């Protein structure tokens, strides 16, 4: 198991008039799906997550040295960003089956591993289901049903 920490930074300025989420297209060779722009429930802008490989799943402090890289990624789709208005916000851990794995080899993302667990009746593993896991939930349920009952 490998741990990909995602650092998030919030934007304190009022000069960006954004009313929707922004999910940039993934770039080949990157370990993640890009630095997103999301809005929290109060309408605050947040940028993240990035991908920082860490040894511990308990390392939840925002790595402030990642700010410059986040700014570079965000300016690709929001060139008017004032980086002086960005602050560390929070971090989370995403467990991964492989450290960069196929992504580092240029083969794309490895996700949606759905399989029976040999030796355990009725046990189905649903591994590495990331974005768009919720959108895919009905198709995932159908696959699980097929594995259990056919």
Please tell me what each predicted stretch does.
Residues 51-58, 127-130, 141:
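Repeat-unit-sized solenoid/scaffold elements
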Residues 1-119:
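Active-site substrate-recognition segment that forms the wall
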Residues 138-150:
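Internal hydrophobic alpha-helix adjacent to the cofactor/substrate pocket in enzyme cavities
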Residues 27-28, 123-137:
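Glycine-rich phosphate/pyrophosphate-binding beta-alpha loops
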Residues 67-71, 134, 145:
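Short, hydrophobic/amphipathic alpha-helical packing segments
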């Amino acid at each position: 198991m490998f741990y990909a920490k995602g650092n998030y930074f919030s934007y304190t300025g009022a000069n960006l008039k954004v009313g929707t989420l922004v999910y940039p297209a993934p770039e080949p060779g990157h370990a993640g799906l890009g630095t997103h722009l999301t809005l929290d429930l109060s309408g605050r802008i947040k940028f993240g997550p990035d991908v920082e490989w860490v040894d511990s799943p308990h390392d939840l402090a925002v790595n402030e040295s990642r700010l410059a890289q986040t700014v570079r990624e965000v300016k690709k789709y929001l060139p008017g960003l004032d980086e002086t208005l960005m602050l560390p916000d929070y971090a989370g851990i995403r467990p991964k089956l492989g450290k960069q794995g196929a992504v580092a080899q240029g083969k794309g993302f490895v996700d949606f591993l759905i399989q029976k667990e040999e030796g355990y009746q009725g046990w189905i593993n649903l591994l590495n289901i990331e974005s768009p896991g919720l959108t895919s939930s009905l198709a995932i349920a159908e696959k699980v049903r097929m594995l259990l009952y056919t």
